[in-house]
Amino acid sequence: MRAAVESGAVDMPQEGFRKTYFHWIENLYDWCISRQIWFGHRIPVWYREQEVYCGVTPPEGDGWEQDPDVLDTWFSSALWTFSTLGWPEDTKDLETFHPTSFMSPAYEILQLWVSRMILMSGFHLGQVPFKKVMIHGLVRAKDGRKFSKSLNNGVDPLEMIEKYGADALRMGLIVGAVIGSDIRFDEQKVKAYKLFANKVWNIARFVLSQERTGDIKTELKEEFDALAKEVTADMENYRVYMAAEKLYHYLWGRFAAEILEESKGKPEYGKTLYYILENSLKLLHPFMPFITEEIWNSMPGKKELLMVEEWPIK
């Protein structure tokens, strides 16, 4: 478990969480793996008077009684990366998709799940379960407390989606969410991104009403391409909150408020507007997949899904 992270086989770049991980390994304690709950893997142990049998299949003969307990949830979950791919059979999926490329759990299950996946995968396959792990924080209530049934402060995401749309909820959770840090859920923030979704829709309506005329204006193209490079770099370095916020400010404060206003009555802007819109949809798609896909489907000559289009920056 230590060697997998120390060697870099599992890249855990957040130093604070690396220290937490190693501290736990250096201070291991016994783990009771049996649980008295309704669902789970049955413990493969049978008893008959003073006899005890452990095996994959039930023992032969009469009078055997299987242990009534099940394995701890985290014991079973630790097998996830390979058990879902057909293990213990040597399947094509297991060969192709294991180890997983990237894992992003919350910090509260770093020991419960991440460390135990590394343990189980190493024991059973001699492999790491994933190549990189980035730890994220928790979504808390507006006052900073954990969501809790006893506090009755939970938020039903389906209600938020019904009220504001899935894209607005996604943006409300992404912007401001520094990786590894907790965020406070604020419904007003989600509401604000519903207004942004409306703005994106109106931007598209205006651009699609224009003819694709004129030459692409070099200055505006270079400005947008510079933004696209910044957004791409942010995403590659897991600063997704910064990437989303930059797109928000550009589309609303620059493209809609300035460039579109300047272009009104000027057909020579046509190709430039289409260039910016098309590539903005590509950049925004990971954050707001539904509205961007819908707009893309309305654009002339677009047959493939937006999600399989080439990224603007190679």
Predicted regions and their residues:
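C-terminal low-complexity, glycine/proline- and small-hydrophobic-enriched intrinsically disordered tails
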Residues: 191, 300-314
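Structured secondary-structure scaffolds
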Residues: 1-212, 220-264, 271-285
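Aromatic/acidic polysaccharide-binding cleft in carbohydrate-active enzymes
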Residues: 297
